[in-house]
């Protein structure tokens, strides 16, 4: 008897990594699981990055520095998150998983709020910063539900 009997779709769902604060060992285990399980789809439920450089909490009760001071920190975080995604994508590619979703979380939205404040820096918006389209991810805005079959996925 096949162990897959009755399985409609197999998915790996990962919430709240908060890169660069993520657990590297746990991430390694998830990557190994992806390669073994060979899921039909991958869902990132949001808060992919911590994005502390653009957090409204960062400057609470303090004067916000000029944007020229913030940009290098944002770029460093973007680089870190993209390296993380490169590793995840490598495992997803090995597993043959082509269907990939990413739901923006509240932390991810902070990048978009930053762009709202500095519209000429639109390359720092979350979707563009993580290269969602280039990577082949189906992007879902924060607050939107992702429905697959009878299941709903949401970053709450």
What are these regions (language model features)?
Residues 20-133:
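Core catalytic region of metal-dependent phosphoesterases/phosphodiesterases
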Residues 118-156:
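Charged, low-complexity C-terminal accessory regions
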Residues 1-22, 28-32:
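Acidic, histidine-bearing metal-coordination/catalytic regions of metal-dependent phosphoesterases
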């Amino acid at each position: 008897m096949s162990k897959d009997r009755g399985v409609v779709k197999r998915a790996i769902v990962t919430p709240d990594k908060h890169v660069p604060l993520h657990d590297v060992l746990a991430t390694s285990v998830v990557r190994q699981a992806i390669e073994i399980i060979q899921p039909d789809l991958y869902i990132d439920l949001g808060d992919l990055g911590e994005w502390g450089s653009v957090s409204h909490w960062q400057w609470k009760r303090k004067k916000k520095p000029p944007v020229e001071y913030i940009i290098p920190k944002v770029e460093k975080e973007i680089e870190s998150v993209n390296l993380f995604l490169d590793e995840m994508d490598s495992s997803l590619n090995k597993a043959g998983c082509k269907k990939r979703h990413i739901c923006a979380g509240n932390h991810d939205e902070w990048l978009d709020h930053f762009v709202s404040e500095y519209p000429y820096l639109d390359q720092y918006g979350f979707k563009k910063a993580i290269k969602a389209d280039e990577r082949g991810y189906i992007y879902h805005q924060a607050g939107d539900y992702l429905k697959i079959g009878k299941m709903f996925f949401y970053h709450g």
